[in-house]
Every structure is written in C-alpha cells, then in structure tokens.
Amino acid sequence: MLSPKKQKYRKAQKGRVASKAKAGTMIAFGEFGLKSLDSCRITSRQIEAARRAAVRCMKRQGKFWINIFPSIPVSKKPTEVRMGKGKGATEFFAARVAVGRILFELDGVSESIAIKALELAGAKLPVRTKIVKRYE
C-alpha cells in the first residue's frame, strides 16, 4: 500500500476537498484514463484494491499509472474513549480527490480490455467515475 516515506508533521487537520481540480485533469501518460466525478477522500487501501483489479484484468500487459498519492494522515481515536486526551493515532493515509481529477491511466492494451479494467477499478472506489480517452 502507498504511504509517504517522510512527513513534515505527524498529524494533519481534517480540511476539505476542493470542489474542482485545478491540476491533473488531462491524461498525461496513457491512452485511457479514469476521471472522478465527485470529490472525496480515497484511502491507500482503496487505491491498491483498484490497482489490483485493473492489473488483473489487463493480465499484466500494458502499463498502468496511479496519478494520486495518499499523503494525508487520518487519525482516529479508539471506540468508547471519552472526549479529550489529545488527538488519536494515525489510522491510515488518504488522498484528497477533486471533481475532474484523473485517478488512473493505462496504455498498451486494446480498447475493450482498457474499458473493462477501468470499470473494475472504478467499482472499488468511493467516487463516481468516468472513462476518458486521450484527445477526447
């Protein structure tokens, strides 16, 4: 699973996900891409599950790119713990994804396999997604 090697701060504030993506809205590497239609926080486990589903469908042919990185530590307190006593420990890492952001890209496979792989990957994510083609 993806996680940052080094962090400036151990814990982060909750923050908000931007409504529309300012960068990362165009396909940069591959021929096909998976674009988000909602804004959301995606965990490193969800990214890994989507990657595995897509790569398995591609039968390890072609190339697969992940365009998002879970760099935000999300902390959580244990259940049935009273208020106070500081912020909880880091539970997982997440990536903030805005509307219009390209999440994954792939290349080197036929269009039918690419669409099927990206549909499987999109099913593993908590956002609505759309498959886009380069120059479309």
Swiss-Prot record:
GO terms for biological process: translation. GO terms for cellular component: cytosolic large ribosomal subunit. Keywords: Ribonucleoprotein, Ribosomal protein, RNA-binding, rRNA-binding, tRNA-binding. GO terms for molecular function: rRNA binding; structural constituent of ribosome; tRNA binding. InterPro entries: Ribosomal_uL16, Ribosomal_uL16_bact-type, Ribosomal_uL16_CS, Ribosomal_uL16_dom, Ribosomal_uL16_sf. SUPFAM superfamilies: Ribosomal protein L16p/L10e (SSF54686). Part of the 50S ribosomal subunit. Belongs to the universal ribosomal protein uL16 family. Binds 23S rRNA and is also seen to make contacts with the A and possibly P site tRNAs. This is Large ribosomal subunit protein uL16. It comes from Orientia tsutsugamushi (strain Boryong) (Rickettsia tsutsugamushi).
